Amino acid sequence: MEPIILASSSPRRQEILKMLGIPFQVIMPNVNEAIASRIAPNNTTELLAREKIIDVLHTLPSNQKIPWVLSADTIVTKNSKIYGKPKNQEEAERFIKEFQGATHTVITSVALYNGKTRTTTTKTVETKVTFAPMTSEEIKWYIDTGEWHGAAGGYRIQSLASLFISKIEGSQSCVTGLPIYELYDMLKEQGYSVLESFE
């Protein structure tokens, strides 16, 4: 099975590739996310996912054979406002206060570069997440866990935040940052067999 370059530093995305038995190496892209600040949220993630691939391709030696590059980008949005990764504890607390007792949307785009065809394909997934009403003590407790560090929207659905999430409409793996079905479908369309790793 051919190795994939993962253009992401996300531990969760790495865990998903390991679970699927896909060999990969990580190259962290250097993309200015401010370039997407003036476009619609559902276009933001696709643009950034593509930019991450372009950045990684430019860092590789020109004579290096590049079979596959995979990237993804996730944003959280509510009432047309985008919630990125909180800069500090106060911002993380504000995010959770705005999410509690309400529904927001998580958008993840996956981009896959095929080195044989030199083309990039993308898929975008949206999932609605509803937080139950939370007390100030619950919000403080969650923020004090530190899970908000490095997480879009300031929470991790696959961990302790799940205590307060009452409803998910759509793909849970979209919320964790790499929609598994869409990834599998893209790889299959491009002739990359994930199933080989289990034979």
Task: Give the ranges of each region predicted by the language model.
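N-terminal beta1-alpha1 ligand-phosphate binding loop
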Residues: 2-22
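Anionic-ligand binding patches
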Residues: 2-5, 40-199
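Cofactor-binding loop segments of dinucleotide-utilizing enzymes, especially the Rossmann-like FAD-
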Residues: 9, 29, 115
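A short local structural element in Rossmann-fold oxidoreductases
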Residues: 18, 36, 140
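Short glycine-rich, Thr/Ser-proximal phosphate-binding strand/loop in the N-terminal lobe
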Residues: 21-38, 120-126
